[in-house]
Regions:
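Active-site-proximal substrate-binding groove within the catalytic cores of carbohydrate-active enzymes
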Residues: 1-102, 106, 110-134, 139-143
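Generic C-terminus detector
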Residues: 138-156
Length: 156
């Protein structure tokens, strides 16, 4: 981080601690051994997506980013690469609102800002051909414009 920690609130400091712990836990996959895939080009369209898959294809982290939020748009199908077709995977994601949205009480009138978790199972073929379904509502909860989602994918 390149920021002045003395200017952060206690909730922001806790968020930084969680992010550092996540990076330490997944450093081997993200920085050393993982195969990197660009799933959606950041230079074309409104979306961007990347994933990192372990060499033995038992673990992956996928990241989805949007530029601008579309109101009343359909679901997104975020297609992955590099998984084993016949392997069953558990996909998890934290769909809780961003810290900024949680602390903005005006938004509570229009959005359900309770914490929300995604967890389901799918085969690699499904994840690569059909994709992870992403609801626009979840992107609005995460921040709307410039929202992002991080998916943890583990073989069962």
């Amino acid at each position: 981080y390149e920021l002045d920690l003395t200017l952060l609130s206690s909730s922001e400091i806790e968020e930084v601690k969680r992010e550092i712990a996540f990076m330490k836990e997944h450093r081997k996959l993200l920085q050393i051994e993982g195969d990197f895939y660009r799933l959606l080009s950041p230079f074309e369209g409104n979306e961007c997506g990347f994933s990192v898959v372990s060499p033995n294809k038992t673990e992956a982290i996928a990241m989805y980013f949007q530029k601008l939020n579309f109101v009343n748009a359909s679901w997104i199908r975020f297609k992955l690469k590099g998984l084993r077709e016949n392997t069953l995977y558990r996909i998890t994601a934290d769909l809780s609102p961003s810290l900024e949205r949680k602390e903005n009480t005006v938004l509570h009138a229009g959005y359900n800002l309770k914490d929300k978790q995604l967890s389901y199972e799918a085969y690699g073929a499904e994840l690569m051909e059909i994709g992870i379904p992403i609801a626009r509502e979840d992107l609005s909860r995460k921040g709307g414009d410039f929202a992002s989602l991080l998916f943890l994918i583990n073989a069962i």
